[in-house]
């Protein structure tokens, strides 16, 4: 994919906000920051549709909570067509972190994440999506 140069006219306040964004996120230049913002916008537009996206559901939970491991596995098996892989990490004697790599329609991934995150015993979790 080739690079196309173009000029942009902005109000001073907007330019200052862009420069603050560049600095805060350690972009090497404004072009990289604008590219990142456009990519983020494009990805978010895909979330609002039935487009295919990829992502990860990351959860932290107490594995001593009665039957939580089985409940998580059951939800995953019910949606196996969306799950590419999982990684289970023991953070402490009681607490586990699980990363579930997913791919499918954005609304299906959101529904899957909601089912997992609503299980009793999940301390925290988040769905992160990007374009597939």
Residue map of PLM features:
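Solvent-exposed residues in well-ordered beta-strands and their adjoining turns
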Residues: 11, 62, 103-105
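Short Lys/Arg-rich basic patches
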Residues: 1-9, 22
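Short amphipathic alpha-helical segments
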Residues: 8-10, 18, 28-39
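Short glycine-/aliphatic-rich beta-strand segments at the starts of folded cytosolic domains
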Residues: 51-62, 97-99
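Non-DNA-binding regulatory cores of transcription-related proteins
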Residues: 69-127, 131-132
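Short, charge-rich, low-complexity interaction segments located
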Residues: 34, 43-50
């Amino acid at each position: 994919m080739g690079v196309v140069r173009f000029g942009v006219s902005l109000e001073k306040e907007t330019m200052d906000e862009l420069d603050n964004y560049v600095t805060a996120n350690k972009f090497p230049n404004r072009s990289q920051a604008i590219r990142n913002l456009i990519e983020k916008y494009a990805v978010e537009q895909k979330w609002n549709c039935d487009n295919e996206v990829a992502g990860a559901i990351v959860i932290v939970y107490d594995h001593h909570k009665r039957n939580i491991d089985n409940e998580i596995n059951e939800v995953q098996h019910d949606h196996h067509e969306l799950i590419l892989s999982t990684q289970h990490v023991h953070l402490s004697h009681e607490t586990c972190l699980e990363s579930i790599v997913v791919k499918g329609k954005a609304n299906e991934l959101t529904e899957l994440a909601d089912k997992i995150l609503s299980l009793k015993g999940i301390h925290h979790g988040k769905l992160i999506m990007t374009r597939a």
